[in-house]
Amino acid sequence: GVMLKDNHIDAAGGVKAAVEAAKKYAPFVRKIEVETENLDMVREAVEAGADIIMLDNMTPDEMAEALRIIDGRAETECSGNMTKENIATITKLGVDYVSSGALTHSAPILDLSLKHLRAL
C-alpha cells in the first residue's frame, strides 16, 4: 500500500491530486491510505476514493463526525495521542485500526557499537 502524509498532499496540491498521482504512478498498489487532520480533508479523501482514511490527532467528537462522513466507504485508522487511558473510548467509535507511537516512544535504548566488527 501507499500512505499519503501531509507533505505528499501539500506537494501534490491537495488530497484529490495526491490520490490521483498515487493511482497513476503506482497502479499495482492495492490500497491507498490518506492521513487527514480535519473534516474537510476527510471529505476530500472520501471523494478521491481513498481505501483507508487515517484520522490523525482528532478529538473523539471529530473522529465520530469523520466516521459519519466516511459512512463505510473506506477503512478507517485513528492515530495520534492514543494512550492506554483513552484507547477503549476511541475503539468504541468503530474505527478499523488504531496506531500508537506510545508503544515505541518509551522503549529503552540499546547502546550498541559496531567498531570492532570484522568482515568474514
Q: Where in this protein do the model-derived segments appear?
A:
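Glycine- and Gly-Pro-enriched alpha-helical subdomains that act as flexible
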Residues: G1-E62
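Generic structural "secondary-structure junction" signal
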Residues: L4-D6, A11, K84, H105, ...
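Ser/Thr-centric signal marking residues that sit
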Residues: T36, T76, T104
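C-terminal helical cap(s) of enzyme catalytic domains, especially alpha/beta-barrels
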Residues: L67-D71, A88-L93, S100-L120
